[in-house]
């Protein structure tokens, strides 16, 4: 909300994939609480459920989906800052970015610049799925390797062996377990024709 107020946004859209019903429920509850406390006007925050297409992570495809169309990226120009949602100027933020801005404001820049690993500074949220003991989002130094990430996720489940991993989304490729010492970051993975 601070980001929305800072740019004098007329409306806030929160786009959440439908695969996360528990998160959608929490968001509905929190939005309702904000409205009841008159912190925001009813309808100021519009929670939109997405169909879950990976491409909707791209800002213009997400806007298309919010508008009820197929989530396909738009041609540029114009950019969404000029012609975005419902043809209005639009500022798109990732929730993780907003999380870090708030945390840096509360705790100072040291929260990020005091952590360094494998030549990378800061912290990063890693989303872990598969046959690990504790799948979910894990906060680790930005230069973490897949070995570090699996360890943070409680290790492999009993009876399962680590064979390969996908360091990013569907377009990132799959790396063998033998490449477990590479930091999971764009700069390090680029040399292996994949990305995070």
Feature names for model-found ranges:
Residues 149, 187:
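Conserved adenylation A10 loop of the ANL superfamily
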Residues 139, 166-177, 181-184:
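Accessory "access/gating" subregions that flank catalytic or transport cores
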Residues 188-195:
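Single conserved hydrophobic/aromatic residue that forms the stacking wall/gate
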Residues 1-5:
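Histidine-anchored nucleotide/phosphate-binding helix
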Residues 11-18, 166:
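Short internal beta-strands
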Residues 18, 160-163, 175-176:
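Terminal amphipathic helices with adjacent charged low-complexity linkers/tails
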Residues 141-148, 194:
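Short, structural beta-strand-to-alpha-helix junction motif
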Residues 24-142, 153-157:
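Hydrophobic alpha-helical positions that pack around
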């Amino acid at each position: 909300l601070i980001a929305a107020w800072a740019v004098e946004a007329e409306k806030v859209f929160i786009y959440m994939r439908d695969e996360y019903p528990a998160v959608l429920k929490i968001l509905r509850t929190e939005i309702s609480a904000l409205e009841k406390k008159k912190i925001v006007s009813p309808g100021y925050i519009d929670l939109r459920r997405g169909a879950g297409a990976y491409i909707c992570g791209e800002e213009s495809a997400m806007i298309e989906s919010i508008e009820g169309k197929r989530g396909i990226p738009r041609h540029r120009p114009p950019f969404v800052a000029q012609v975005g949602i419902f043809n209005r100027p639009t500022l798109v933020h990732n929730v993780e970015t907003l999380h870090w801005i708030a945390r840096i404001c509360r705790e100072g820049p040291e929260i990020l610049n005091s952590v360094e690993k494998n030549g990378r500074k800061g912290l990063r949220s890693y989303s872990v799925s598969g046959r690990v003991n504790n799948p979910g989002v894990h906060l680790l130094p930005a230069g973490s390797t897949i070995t570090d990430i699996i360890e943070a996720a409680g290790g492999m489940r009993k009876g399962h062996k680590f064979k390969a991993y996908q360091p990013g989304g569907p377009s990132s490729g799959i790396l063998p377990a033998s490449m477990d010492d590479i930091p999971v970051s764009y700069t390090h993975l680029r040399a292996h024709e994949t990305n995070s």
